[in-house]
Swiss-Prot record:
Keywords: Disulfide bond, Ion channel impairing toxin, Knottin, Secreted, Signal, Toxin. This is U14-theraphotoxin-Cg1c. Residues 1-21 form the signal peptide. Disulfide bonds join C50-C64, C57-C69. Belongs to the neurotoxin 10 (Hwtx-1) family. 65 (Jztx-21) subfamily. It comes from the Eukaryota. It is found in: Secreted. GO terms for molecular function: ion channel regulator activity; toxin activity.
Length: 77
């Protein structure tokens, strides 16, 4: 393909623009809402697995703060 060809350059620019736009988080206005809903669900699931939010943890880094049990807070450990 000859890149000095104006239609080819325009096609490449259009594809690049579309790919960049599709990867941008700001393009979808529903993402903050989805994150809020799914984040609340993940927090509740984490609390259930870990015997409560921030339960029985030596420090904040060992808690279920990232929505998964750590080696210090998992049941059965």
């Amino acid at each position: 393909m000859n890149t000095s060809d104006p239609p080819a350059v325009l096609r490449i620019a259009a594809i690049t623009l579309l790919c960049t736009a599709s990867e941008s988080v700001e393009q979808n206005p529903l993402i903050p809402f989805e994150n809020a809903v799914l984040g609340s669900y993940a927090k509740m699931a984490s609390e259930k697995r870990c015997d409560g939010w921030m339960a029985k943890c030596p420090d904040r880094d060992d808690c279920c703060e990232t929505f998964h049990c750590t080696r210090f807070n998992a049941r059965g450990n």
